[in-house]
Amino acid sequence: MAAVGPPQQQVRMAHQQVWAALEVALRVPCLYIIDAIFNSYPDSSQSRFCIVLQIFLRLFGVFASSIVLILSQRSLFKFYTYSSAFLLAATSVLVNYYASLHIDFYGAYNTSAFGIELLPRKGPSLWMALIVLQLTFGIGYVTLLQIHSIYSQLIILDLLVPVIGLITELPLHIRETLLFTSSLILTLNTVFVLAVKLKWFYYSTRYVYLLVRHMYRIYGLQLLMEDTWKRIRFPDILRVFWLTRVTAQATVLMYILRMANETDSFFISWDDFWDLICNLIISGCDSTLTVLGMSAVISSVAHYLGLGILAFIGSTEEDDRRLGFVAPVLFFILALQTGLSGLRPEERLIRLSRNMCLLLTAVLHFIHGMTDPVLMSLSASHVSSFRRHFPVLFVSACLFILPVLLSYVLWHHYALNTWLFAVTAFCVELCLKVIVSLTVYTLFMIDGYYNVLWEKLDDYVYYVRSTGSIIEFIFGVVMFGNGAYTMMFESGSKIRAFMMCLHAYFNIYLQAKNGWKTFMNRRTAVKKINSLPEIKGSRLQEINDVCAICYHEFTTSARITPCNHYFHALCLRKWLYIQDTCPMCHQKVYIEDDIKDNSNVSNNNGFIPPNETPEEAVREAAAESDRELNEDDSTDCDDDVQRERNGVIQHTGAAAEEFNDDTD
């Protein structure tokens, strides 16, 4: 089979996109029906039977709309094909009824609200229009139901019979009889088609039920819902639903404003425009479905914002592409937590603006999480290109300036309350995070500017990051207290209590636990490093070697492990954060009281101390190699001692490359 060329692939992709867009458009009416049912309430003045019947019909409408919403693409197209055919049949019957019984053919003139003429004045012209209309309905009906036999012609003729009776000016009772007979024949044919398709509907329903049950048993409810969510493109459906709803409302409101102002101008004043925007925003979150639709729109905006920032700063991390998921989830949780859709219109607008401020600060925090790794990688890799550093520094500056401006504007227009306190705390925390990142970035850039090893760099970076983590922990505790006060004295809810529990676990407990663990690991590593003997002065010059971890020379001092390997104290301490073994021979790093300084064993470079013959050094090195083999199977050696040393150094170099990526 020949390979598909690029033009054919483009045509195929365009074809698939068109079908996907059509599928999304066909699922949107189901959301309109569900939203209309949820926004309507039964009339309490009616009898109990009528109320129960209305509730049953609403539940049935929600259930049927939900089933149509999750249909497969093929089943969805078939459903709309049959529905369109039945709609054409009903429209044809209504047109025949209205034309036969309610139109004066000798004075027909119908206008719409805009003054546009719909039907011609003269009778023959109206007859021809009715014939063309019924032919269109009949051809569409038989085409959609795929009726190809002689019955298709009879059905079209059946639709034209009432028009023929109208043209021949038959008496009224005969026209009524013809209309009733035509409608009955069309109804019987529709019922017959439904009966024929009922078998297909039964087997399709049974197949879908068995498939869903099978997937539920194998994969569980969560994966089943995720698969359905992706298959029907539910976020796209929500976006189209919300945007079309807002567009329709905007069109109606614009028409009302034009009629109220009695002007033909397309433009409106700024006051009317602001009122229009406020009304659209208020009506755009008046139910749970509309809040979901707004969340889907926010998801799309946040997704492309995140992609733009990633492209601007030059990041390729896949985990940083989750802004389009985090932002809508947070917005929806805030809406549920504050009861946004159930508030009065004025309160809803105020609450929505406050939620958007909180969402903005959260998005800025997420963007900082995107820029911080890029900032650290640029500073640690010693890249001097201005084009690489400027975008990240520019975004960091914006992340510092925007929270300051937001806090200034809010404090200038609002009095202090729990919401303003929370937004201000988030802004101050973000500014401190940016300061910490820029400080660490500056330290690494200073270290890269000098060629000498800066042994205190790790300590300074740890102090800066620890200070930032402690301040962040304090802010987490303060925000927990602010949320507790809000829940007890302002607006308590189960969702707020649940979110406070999550905040206490992730932002307080886990952060404190991880910080304490890091502190203890560092403290233990420092104790172990301080317990190791140190080489300085002339003896350090006699070694004339480099550290096996960082490959830098020993300039000031070196630490000797119990297995008589030597490293920089800083490098060995970083290694001990990861594992408690020697990087060279993988023995435990510990100090015993009876261990003394022994330089009669080979070190990193096979250094032979003075007053010792090479033959003795080789014999002792071979004996030491045998002992290492007996103690640890992870080292490889041959009869040649030098080959063993080379293998160990290569192994250590690979570990050191992985270790050097850690900046803690």
UniProtKB/Swiss-Prot annotation:
Location of this chain's protein in the cell: Endoplasmic reticulum membrane
Cited CDD domains: RING-H2_RNF139 (cd16683)
Annotated positions of the Phosphothreonine modification: T635, T663
PTM sites of type Phosphoserine: S634
Location, primary (coarse class): endoplasmic reticulum
InterPro entries, A to Z: HRD1_E3_ubiq-ligases, TRC8_N_dom, Znf_RING, Znf_RING-CH, Znf_RING/FYVE/PHD
Signal sequence residues: none
Keywords for this protein: Acetylation, Chromosomal rearrangement, Endoplasmic reticulum, Membrane, Metal-binding, Phosphoprotein, Receptor, Transferase, Transmembrane, Transmembrane helix, Ubl conjugation, Ubl conjugation pathway, Zinc, Zinc-finger
Keyword hit for Repeat: no
Entry GO CC: Derlin-1 retrotranslocation complex; endomembrane system; endoplasmic reticulum; endoplasmic reticulum membrane; endoplasmic reticulum quality control compartment; membrane
Induction (UniProt): Down-regulated by sterols (at protein level).
Post-translational modification: Autoubiquitinated. Ubiquitination is induced by sterol and leads to ist degradation via the ubiquitin-proteasome pathway.
Disease: Renal cell carcinoma: Renal cell carcinoma is a heterogeneous group of sporadic or hereditary carcinoma derived from cells of the proximal renal tubular epithelium. It is subclassified into clear cell renal carcinoma (non-papillary carcinoma), papillary renal cell carcinoma, chromophobe renal cell carcinoma, collecting duct carcinoma with medullary carcinoma of the kidney, and unclassified renal cell carcinoma. Clear cell renal cell carcinoma is the most common subtype.
Subunit structure, interactors included: Interacts with MHC class I and HM13. Interacts with VHL. Component of SCAP-SREBP complex composed of SREBF2, SCAP and RNF139; the complex hampers the interaction between SCAP and SEC24B, thereby reducing SREBF2 proteolytic processing. Interacts with SREBF2 (via C-terminal domain). Interacts with SCAP; the interaction inhibits the interaction of SCAP with SEC24B and hampering the ER to Golgi transport of the SCAP-SREBP complex. Interacts with SEC24B. Interacts with INSIG1 and INSIG2.
Official protein name in the record: E3 ubiquitin-protein ligase RNF139
Gene responsible for this protein: RNF139
